């Protein structure tokens, strides 16, 4: 893009846990979806990684806010501040003036008109001149390398931070889908609850996330067992420091109730799939995307439950962002993009 380029094109995966921005086919921003605001002055103290480092460690003057909950905007003002700040992180590449922004943003497939409007308004207030929307399962399918326009059935399960999106896709459209509010954030809460109830220890959200990444599992028996994860925190009864060694077996137990809900949602969508498309899915398998796809043994668990092979998309954390980037390059071709 030259010095006088009038438009900058951005693909944005506005996630509950992380926001990823793609420009010119490259990931230019990958930050936690969180802002830190000064309560007295209203000044933005930090956005993204710096704000996450403050999360759970602030004093009363500074508040950290996660603007999205369950995949949708929960705090409009904070969402706008965050989006504006993250867009500023995208380099202007030597342009002489700020270009107008063309954006494609992904949204949960179960979004209401009000929720879609909130995303659009946030994007426009943050500088978006042309704003398009794409449903997350469609973006996940594109990011997983599937031909979404083909006359055959493809199925994706995208387990993000706020929602799990399950969809059957054919001929550039979503044939049937289900969106449930059981995903990464709920897994994190499950871990906090388990450690509190079973080990009498309080841990914060960040520590629970670290446990999830290190030893989070969907099966109590794995072929490759990860090393136990050590945690330090206060004992609830004594307030004295204690050290725990957490195994993946424990985490499989802690997450079981939530995983059963995801199992059920997948079965519900499979029941809705027309027979001809079902045959395609049984042959091609189902694709897993999102951070939840990284739970150890999840693909095997789901394959055993459904008798259908499950494939983890390449770099599942960024699959939705990649797909949104592909949609951005093909705005005029893909009829499923919404204005």
Go through the PLM ranges and name each one.
Residues 1-159, 167-286, 293-339:
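Nucleotide/phosphate-binding catalytic cleft detector across ATP-hydrolyzing
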């Amino acid at each position: 893009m030259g010095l006088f380029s009038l438009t900058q094109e951005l693909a944005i995966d506005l996630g509950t846990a992380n926001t990823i921005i793609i420009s010119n086919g490259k990931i230019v921003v990958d930050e936690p979806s969180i802002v830190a605001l000064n309560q007295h002055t209203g000044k933005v103290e930090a956005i993204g990684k710096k704000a996450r480092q403050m999360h759970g460690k602030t004093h009363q003057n500074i508040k950290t806010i996660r603007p999205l909950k369950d995949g949708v905007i929960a705090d409009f003002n904070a969402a706008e501040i965050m989006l504006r700040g993250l867009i500023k992180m995208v380099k202007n590449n030597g342009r002489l003036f700020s270009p107008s922004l063309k954006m494609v943003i992904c949204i949960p497939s179960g979004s209401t008109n009000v929720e879609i409007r909130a995303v659009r308004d946030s994007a426009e207030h943050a500088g978006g001149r042309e704003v398009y929307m794409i449903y997350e399962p469609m973006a996940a399918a594109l990011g997983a390398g599937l031909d979404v326009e083909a006359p055959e059935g493809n199925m994706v399960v995208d387990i993000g931070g706020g929602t799990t999106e399950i969809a059957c896709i054919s001929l550039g459209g979503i044939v049937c889908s289900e969106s449930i509010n059981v995903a990464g954030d709920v897994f994190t809460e499950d871990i906090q609850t388990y450690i509190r109830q079973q080990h009498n220890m309080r841990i914060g959200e960040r520590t629970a996330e670290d446990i999830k990444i290190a030893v989070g599992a969907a099966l109590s028996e794995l072929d490759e067992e990860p090393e136990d994860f050590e945690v330090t925190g206060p004992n609830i009864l004594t307030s004295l420091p204690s050290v725990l060694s957490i195994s993946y077996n424990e985490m499989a137990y802690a997450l079981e109730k939530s995983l059963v809900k995801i199992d059920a949602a997948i079965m519900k969508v499979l029941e809705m799939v027309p027979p001809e498309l079902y045959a395609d899915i049984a042959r091609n398998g189902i694709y897993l995307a999102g951070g939840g796809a990284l739970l150890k043994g999840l693909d095997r668990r789901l394959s055993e439950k459904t008798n259908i092979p499950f494939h983890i998309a390449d770099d599942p954390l960024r699959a939705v962002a990649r797909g949104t980037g592909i949609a951005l390059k093909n705005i005029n071709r893909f009829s499923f993009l919404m204005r």
